[in-house]
Amino acid sequence: MQSMKDAAASAKAGMEKAKASMQEKVDQMKTRDPNEKEMARERKEERQEDAELRKQEARHHNATAGHVGGGGIGGTGYTTAGYNIGDTGGYGGTGGHDNRGYPTAGSGYDTGRQDDLSSMGFGGDTEGAYGTTGNQDFPNAASNNAGTRRNTRGGTQDDPYYRSY
């Protein structure tokens, strides 16, 4: 399970790095100013470093997630609310977790890091959580735009993509 999560984190980081490279190329094509081209390169490098940092954080989180609970007598150490901080098994101490669920104490997590990712091009979604109210396709349980979805329940007369041959 951990290796699958690590592979997913690597794939996501790879996609973010590729996206940063493509955005740099677009920005460089749009301008002739060498300063703007240099700024585009710097933005790309910053985005790639941020993607690598998030990948490493996810790997660290995946490696410690199974050890955080520790469990007491007759317990697993896990609760429905997340981590059981009372019995940390040597991980995390009495610290909390950041907004993505990563431990902030004893993990080497940089608490001074800026998490303003609104300029990354993916809406600034830093929560990493999905709602469970029937709209799992949308980050943070954002309301879906029903007008852009294909309606297959109303029959063929309501389906704008239906073609009768």
Curated annotation (Swiss-Prot):
Basic and acidic residues composition bias: residue spans: 14-60
Taxonomic superkingdom: Eukaryota
Chain intervals with Gly residues compositional bias: 67-76
InterPro entries for this protein: LEA_1 (IPR005513)
Pfam families given in the database record: LEA_1
Compositional bias annotation for Low complexity: 1-13
Region of interest (Disordered), ranges: 1-76, 92-165
BP terms from Gene Ontology: embryo development ending in seed dormancy; response to abscisic acid; response to cold; response to salt stress; response to water deprivation
Sequence ranges of Polar residues compositional bias: 132-155
Family, as annotated: Belongs to the LEA type 1 family.
Other known facts: This is a SET 5a protein.
Function summary: LEA proteins are late embryonic proteins abundant in higher plant seed embryos. There are two subsets of LEA proteins (5a and 5b), the first ones are expressed when the cotyledon weight reach 80 mg and the second set are expressed above 100 mg. The function of those proteins is not known.
Protein name: Late embryogenesis abundant protein D-113
Organism for this UniProt entry: Gossypium hirsutum (Upland cotton)
Organismal lineage: Eukaryota, Viridiplantae, Streptophyta, Embryophyta, Tracheophyta
